[in-house]
Amino acid sequence: MKPFPRAEISSKALQNNLARLREIAPGSKVMAVVKANGYGHGLLNVAHCLDNADGFGLARPEEALALREGGVKSKLILLEGFFSQVDLTTLVEHDIDTVVHNEVQLELLESSILAKPATVWLKIDSGMHRLGFTPEQFAAVYARLEACPQVAKPINLMSHFACADEPDNPSTKVQINLFNDLIKDLPGQRSLANSAGTLYWPESQADWIRPGIALYGVSPVIGDLGGNHGLMPAMELVSQLIAVRDHKAGEPVGYGSSWYAKEDTKLGVVAIGYGDGYPRNAPEGTPVWVNGRRVPIVGRVSMDMLTVDLGINATDLIGDDAILWGKALPVEEVAEHIGTIAYELVTKLTPRVAVCLD
């Protein structure tokens, strides 16, 4: 018996998406971003499936170490860098590249005695104003890294977009120009484009692209779909109907009796709720896919269940699949109904949801 709820992960879709991104950025290497448990798709699942990626981007040291312990030998890049001497020593020991974005990290490098030089990506704050050295700091920081014997040469260079998922926002072009002006004539590898940069700003693709959400078949742009770019959804979130009930006009359903039927109908109870990571704030009308059609959520999402209006003539049965998002019902569409982004939906599934790679 298959577990439910479950997130079915398509290796075919993952491989398609990597190949498609290579077509979109033919002159760039691909740093596949697999942080946050592979965007909810399973860290090792994704890394082994995409073992032909040129490297993997992680947020935290434990994620990178999990890949090394899982047999992944590819290039790994720690996007938030290290925050202790122990972390730095461990990264070097396991051949993990590190981003350097603040003075504390720089001083740790300068004061360390390492078994071999660390491979560094110097992060420039070109407009995101979250991590990185400012343009005014850049030259001095670069010179200190150049002079540091604990840093492998050449130094690699990186920045991150603030608004690339808004294709008409002029600030992205400003960031591209600022980054290119600062690093002009310097050696080392360059990386600027995230998923949105890769898809919408080809001039940002540089030596390495860093796709995250696009690898999983999802568009980073609200109102867009991954399928519009030849991407395939890699996750299908599936549960089952555990009850089908006749429901009379005027009767409520669920906590708070927030929804009343306007006419006689049949309701289906789906075995998934906020305890599984499905958002409690999903409003009435959010679609679920049952037997080839969209049916709306009615009433409140509870911890283990939600209810859908199947319609008076429904022939659905207990045990039938209910798809919360996937090929037929894009996660981007569900996110828009809920008032969130697809990133949040796929990364917030709890351990109660079985993640199954085909």
Curated annotation (Swiss-Prot):
Reactions performed catalytically: L-alanine = D-alanine
Please tell me whether the keyword Isomerase is annotated for this protein: yes
**Cofactor(s) listed:** pyridoxal 5'-phosphate
Q: Which HAMAP family match?
A: Ala_racemase (MF_01201)
Highest taxon above the source species:
Bacteria
- The name under which this protein is listed is Alanine racemase
Positions contributing to substrate binding: R130, M303
Sequence positions bearing N6-(pyridoxal phosphate)lysine: K35
What family does the Swiss-Prot or TrEMBL record give for this protein?
Answer: Belongs to the alanine racemase family.
Going by the record, the broad EC class of this enzyme is isomerase
Q: What residues sit in the active site?
A: K35 (proton acceptor), Y255 (proton acceptor)
Q: Keyword set for this entry?
A: Isomerase, Pyridoxal phosphate
Origin organism is Shewanella sediminis (strain HAW-EB3)
| Cellular compartments per GO CC | cytosol
Q: What is its EC number?
A: 5.1.1.1
SMART domains given in the database record: Ala_racemase_C
